[in-house]
Amino acid sequence: MPGENCVIIGAGGLGHIAIQCMKAMCAANIIVVEKAKAPLEHAMELGADHGVLIDGNEIEKVKELTKGKGAEAVIDFVGEKGSTPMGIKMTKATGTFYIVGYGEEIRVLAIDMIDQEKSIVGSLVGTWAELYELMELADKGLVKLSMKEYKLEEANKALHDLNDGKIKGRAVLVP
């Protein structure tokens, strides 16, 4: 909805696609939170309204961008290294935190969730209808996959580049 905010944590393999889908399908203000500059710059090129670099002040920056409230929706494509508690704190009262990335334990005080009426939703894959909708957006040129190819013997370099935030989008190993 116009005037609402959506935070996307992680602008990598899935996050960069989500930015484009959100831009094509809704009028929400898109705030991307990223640990590395290259993916954050790429997110801005893809249409994100705001970019926030993880530097220890990211929660305050998101609160500032959302007039002190937090976002109606926060989608965490990372799911590790503290992104989950960070994302829950960025979610406004009555908002929803969507967890897509996995690897981290979710620990929250029940009273915080109850008092603020926040929701947590896990998402592994979409429906066939959603996949069809994504393919239509791609066919119209509204969603494009960003990727960097590596030879199979460069797998370690690909992992290092991913970890260092040097890749815009997906890393793909080819034989």
Kindly label every feature range from the protein language model.
Residues 72-75, 98:
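N-terminal Rossmann-like NAD(P) cofactor-binding module of classical short-chain dehydrogenase/reductase
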Residues 91-93:
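Helix-to-beta-strand junctions that scaffold the AdoMet/dcAdoMet cofactor pocket
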Residues 62-71:
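A short acidic, Gly/Pro-enriched loop at the edge of an enzyme's catalytic core
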Residues 12-16, 81-82, 104:
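Residue-level detector of alpha-helix initiation sites
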Residues 11, 37, 73, 85-89, ...:
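C-terminal hydrophobic helical "lid"/dimerization subdomain
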Residues 1-56, 61:
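Mid-domain Rossmann-like dinucleotide-binding core that forms the NAD(H)/NADP(H) cofactor-binding site
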Residues 96-98, 108-148:
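Rossmann-fold dehydrogenase core element
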Residues 35-36, 103, 126:
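Residues in the short beta-alpha loop(s) of Rossmann-like NAD(P)-binding domains
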